[in-house]
């Protein structure tokens, strides 16, 4: 797993900052005033990412309040950050937060998009997990036509991209060609590789 390690300027390991069965997806910065590291990880689920703060003693605080895929851009003094999140049911929302996670202002809500989409039947992704023959758990999503009937046969498209550092199965909002194909009567399936 990718984790944060704290080194001296001379290259000597001081301590491992994070540990566990999850990955640190991005290091966001260090605040010398409160001796804290800020980062994004998938601690709650491999499908979700949240913003965290951890001090030098290991006290960790989750700063993101919304489930789904969160990303952050901190100010140069590490006192404020822009949080961008979405999930399967929520188009991108952007907030201005202080470094404790408190939302100071909501900058983008996408309310007009939500209102427009409420007038249409849009296929939705459904997550699933399965184990391979050798016991490895893989995550996937399936998108069925809106008027899906279990008694009918449908053509199936399997979307697969296993490029380096890629992950396609995430709790994030999108409308893409897969949505279009499901709206045209296809079942679309995606599974992340190992």
Task: Identify the meaning behind each predicted range.
Residues 48-50, 169:
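Long, heptad-repeat coiled-coil alpha-helices that serve as cytosolic signaling/dimerization stalks
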Residues 7-32, 41-44, 54-70, 99-124:
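Multi-bladed beta-propeller domains
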Residues 1-2, 46-48, 91, 151-153:
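Short secondary-structure junction motifs
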Residues 2-3, 50, 68, 126:
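Residue-level marker for the onset of beta-strands and adjacent loop->beta junctions
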Residues 49, 57-84:
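Repeat-solenoid scaffold signature
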Residues 1, 7-8, 18, 37-45, ...:
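Beta-strand C-termini and the immediately following turn/loop, strongest in propeller blades
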Residues 3-5, 50-52, 93-95:
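A short loop-to-beta-strand structural motif that recurs across blades of beta-propeller domains
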Residues 71-194:
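Serine-hydrolase catalytic core recognition
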């Amino acid at each position: 797993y990718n984790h944060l390690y704290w080194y001296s300027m001379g290259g000597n390991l001081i301590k491992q900052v994070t540990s566990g069965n999850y990955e640190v997806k991005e290091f966001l910065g260090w605040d010398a005033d409160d001796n804290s590291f800020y980062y994004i990880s998938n601690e709650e689920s491999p499908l979700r990412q949240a913003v965290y703060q951890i001090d030098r003693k290991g006290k960790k605080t989750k700063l993101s309040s919304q489930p789904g895929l969160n990303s952050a851009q901190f100010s140069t003094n590490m006192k404020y950050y822009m949080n961008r999140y979405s999930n399967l049911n929520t188009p991108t929302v952007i907030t201005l937060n202080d470094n404790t996670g408190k939302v100071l202002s909501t900058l983008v809500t996408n309310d007009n998009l939500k209102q427009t989409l409420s007038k249409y039947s849009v296929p939705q992704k459904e997550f699933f997990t399965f184990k391979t023959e050798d016991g490895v758990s893989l995550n996937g999503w399936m998108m069925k036509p809106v008027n899906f009937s279990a008694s009918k046969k449908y053509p199936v498209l399997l979307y697969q991209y296993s490029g380096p550092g890629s992950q396609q199965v995430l709790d994030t909002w999108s409308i893409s060609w897969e949505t279009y194909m499901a709206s045209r009567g296809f079942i679309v399936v995606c599974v992340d590789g190992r």
